[in-house]
Structures are given as structure tokens and as C-alpha cells.
Amino acid sequence: MLFSKLFAPTLKEPPKDAVLKSPKHPGKAGYIYQIGSGIYNFLPLAKKVLDKIENVTHKRMQEHGAQNILMSFVVLASLWEKSGRLDKYGKELLVFKDRKDNDFVLSPTLEENITEIAANFIKSYKQLPVHLYQIHTKFRDEIRPRFGLVRAREFIMKDGYSFHEDAESLDKEFLNTQSAYKEILSDLGLDFRIVEADSGAIGGSKSREFVVLTECGEDTIVVCQNCDYAANIEIAKRSKRTEPLMSPSALAKFPTPNTTSAPSVAEFFKTEPYFVLKALVNKVIHKDKETLACFFVRGDDNLEETKALNTLNLLGANALELREANEEDLNKAGLIAGFIGPYGLKKHVCYIIFDEDLKEGDCLIVGANEKDFHAVGVDLKGFENLVYADIVQVKESDCCPNCQGALKYHKSLEVGHIFKLGQSYAKSLKASFLDKNGKERFFEMGCYGIGISRLLSVILEQKSDDLGCVWTKNTAPFDVVIVVSNLKDEAQKKLAFEVYERLLQKGVDALLDDRDARFGAKMRDFELIGERLALIVGKQTLESKEFECIKRANLEKQTIKDIELEEKILEMLASE
């Protein structure tokens, strides 16, 4: 490719709203162009990178037995209604009507579509297992698109779905796809972790995220410093804590004027917040109503909203989301902020859940459900039919549930997610097959996704520097850019074109910078665009028969003799 023919409209300054490297560098380098909030055009350089990411993905998925298909971007809303997700997914789901007043959705995920295909064409266990995948455009109506392609509204996604006759077969494919994803991300040169995760709106019994560690990450993962335990903070667990020493006290009610927070209550009674029962009241949003739930945790813990919501739904609440109850909500329920406790609480709220760390809770200080009063010496074993669950957010001071090692937070970006869906979609959409005994059974399903366009951003966040884009071995738009020092020197120009042809013949993806521009400007574009190598052709090259070669990853310079040029270039490209 000749640079003079390349459509790469570079800018003097990055886009004004670009904060991170991933929208800043490709925006300035002419990779992408934003035409709306969270909506981007991919120009030739970005399309080359995306194609390379997709090629790696296709190769590894097909090596692991998956078959490539292409599904409709537009799906009947009635399918989403059958699965129950039309309301559950929320406002991020874009719903529209056609001219005949039929409802459709722009797909953010395709569980309903693929299940409909399976229901119509997979009739026997003999056709199982099967794993189908696609790479296609998706749409999610994000309320606040941010970080460029990391959190865009329109994006490119690799979606995969597998169908099985039993859970054992699904387990095998889950691990098979996990291996494929590890190979894909390794081929792309990323430093990543696999963590236990929440299934979110997609649902399912088990899920794992593939995350890339980066300081600009929008997610927090919890990692053990001693073993391989890692989990998204939304579901992270900890080992049972050692209880501080506390002298037993008799059950009594004390006046505690204006003492409404766990730390202030602990200070008032000269004890640790650990022994204070903290009440957190939330509004539970259902499809057609709102209720109240009260969650109890120790005073030095915080509620993890995802765990709390999942626990409610395990109890049959069919909750869509949680919102913190305000003073008006509490007043309507007859509750007093700062003094809420378990005594007589059932008449005020619909759901009461205690963190599992409170199962043996005694010597507790709790709100008396009376203004300016707390009860001390409370033993929860004296209450009947309490519901316990893991609802707290793990802290960095907590210990690993596997080995007791120290847990630490890391910022990360999710790039892939795999789920065991079980039979949930098959049951709701009536997708079944005949087993070996001739009995009708529902499919066991798996779901597997990788953010293709997000990977473009993530690679830049992890690899780039302040000068511009740095790509990995299998993702750079060009292997080599040939930079002519003085294009008006016919000898330099002639040699540059000869070298260009020599490299093309060896299969090197080369770009010849034949623009009539200053040498410094060309080198700045090399640093900005991020070809893997820059090969300099100048006056000294003509005299010494040696080329200066610069690696973009670390800007390391190397001298290469003309006679060894192709061999050395291929070695350098293979080694990174």
C-alpha cells in the first residue's frame, strides 16, 4: 500500500472529548470517526485491525469445533416477550415498530434468535452437541456511552451458543470454549485474567469473565495474592472472618440521641463497628410495582447490590433492579433512618435478608425501630426463620475463600464472557428434542461472547504509549512502513520502491510512505499510527547499504544490512 493512496485522515489534535488512549490515539490517527453518541465509523486502518482480530477469532473457534453463521440484527419483540427479557433488560433494549405496527428489537444479545433456530431444526439427540457462532453488529442503548469503543452503543460482537442433551456435555463445551478464548486473547498479545462473574441480564447458573488489567478499567476484580482465585467484585467471596473479642452484655435498650451511623454507634458504645447491625433499605423495582427490602450487614461491611438483587430473585421476587430508599420512602413505611432493626420489621418491609456472616451473630447492637434508641446484647439466634445469604462486598482486608491469602482490588475491562444457561431459554421458548429413549427434553445451553470492537480499544489501553498507537503482533494494520528521508532524491525513491516490492514478495504487509512531506512529520505519523516497524531509506542507506529499522513497541533502533534485509525483517516480525 502506498501512503499517498491510503485514506487515513490524521488530525493535529485528538477529539476533544477523548480522555483515554483508546479513543484519543485512533481518533487522531484516522482509524475511527464518531458520528453520534456511542456510534463510530471504522475507517480503513481500523477495519484492517478489526479484520485481523476477527481472523484470529474465526481460526480458534473453528479449531475448537464451532460453526460460523450470521443471524438477523433485527429480532421480533415477541421472542423477547416469551423469554421474559423484554421487560427485564430495561431501557438499554431499543424497541421499534415497523410500518405494520409490529414490534422489533435491535439485538444486544441473540439468545432468543438462536433458540428459535434450534427449536425448528434440531429434533434429535443425534444432532447434538452443536456450537454456532457469529461476528456481527449489535446495539445497546447505553444511557451514558463513554470511553470510546469500550462502552459504545453500536459495537461488533462475537456471539456463540451451544446446545446439548445433558449438563455433562455442556460442562465439556464450557471448558472447551474457555480454552478457545484463552488462545484468542493470547494470540492477540493481551495480559488477561479469567474471573468468576455474575450472569446479569443473560442469566444462567455459572459464568466467567475474561478481563484485561488496566488502570482505566470500568470494572473491579478481586484477586488473591497467594493463589489463582479471582472474581468480579459483584460476586467475590471471602473466608469466614475471625470475630474480635467482646464482653457479653445483657439485652437492653439504650437512648442514643443523634447516633445514626454504624461508626457513630460503635463509638457511642466504645466497641468495634463489627458488632453493629447496619440496616440498608432498598426499593425493589418489579415489572408492575415497587416494594421495600431491608438488608442487614455488619457495621464494617457494605452491601453488594448485585448479590442482593440475585438473592431476592432466588426468593422469587422477580426484581428488575434495586434503588436506595429515600427518607420519604422510609417515612411511608413507618421506619426511622439510623434506628432500623429486626424487631417488628416484617410489618414494614416485604423482604428481610441478613448477611451470612451474621449467622452466629450475638452481642450485637441493633436499631430499636424507635427514634434515638438502640438495643444491645442482641443474639440473632433468638429470631425465627431468618433468611441468610452472601450479600456483602468483599474488602481488600478480607481473606481468600480458598487459601486465606490476602485479597486485592484491580481495575479491569471485560473483553469476553462465557455462561452456562442451562434450560432457562429452552423452557421459555419451548425448544426441545427427543433423547435416546424417545422422550422429549429441553436443551441445555451455553452462551459465549467476545467484544471484537472493544478488543481494538483494549489492546491500545494496555499497549500504547503517549506518542500513539502500539499494536500487538497479530493486530497491527501494517507490518512495516518504509519512510523515505528525501523523496526528491531519485536514488532514495528508487531504492524505497525496490525494498517495498522485495518485502511484498516475502508476504510482508508493507506501507510505503511516498508522501511529499517532511521526514519528521512522517516519523510522527509512524509513532501515531503504530506500524510494527519503520524502515528508513536515506542518504546514508545509499552510501552504506544499511537500513535503520525502528520497533514501534519500544522505539528500539537496529541497523540491517541490505543483503540480510528480508531475513532480518521476517525474524523481527516473528519474534514479537
From Swiss-Prot:
InterPro entries: aa-tRNA-synt_IIb, aa-tRNA-synth_II, aa-tRNA-synth_II/BPL/LPL, Anticodon-bd, Anticodon-bd_dom_sf, Pro-tRNA-ligase_IIa, Pro-tRNA-synth_IIa_bac-type, Pro-tRNA-Synthase_IIa_type1. Its main location: cytoplasm. Catalyzes the attachment of proline to tRNA(Pro) in a two-step reaction: proline is first activated by ATP to form Pro-AMP and then transferred to the acceptor end of tRNA(Pro). As ProRS can inadvertently accommodate and process non-cognate amino acids such as alanine and cysteine, to avoid such errors it has two additional distinct editing activities against alanine. One activity is designated as 'pretransfer' editing and involves the tRNA(Pro)-independent hydrolysis of activated Ala-AMP. Consists of three domains: the N-terminal catalytic domain, the editing domain and the C-terminal anticodon-binding domain. The gene is proS. This is Proline--tRNA ligase. GO terms for cellular component: cytosol. SUPFAM superfamilies: Class II aaRS ABD-related (SSF52954), Class II aaRS and biotin synthetases (SSF55681), YbaK/ProRS associated domain (SSF55826). PANTHER family: MITOCHONDRIAL RIBOSOME PROTEIN L39/PROLYL-TRNA LIGASE FAMILY MEMBER (PTHR42753), PROLINE--TRNA LIGASE (PTHR42753:SF2). GO terms for molecular function: aminoacyl-tRNA deacylase activity; ATP binding; proline-tRNA ligase activity.
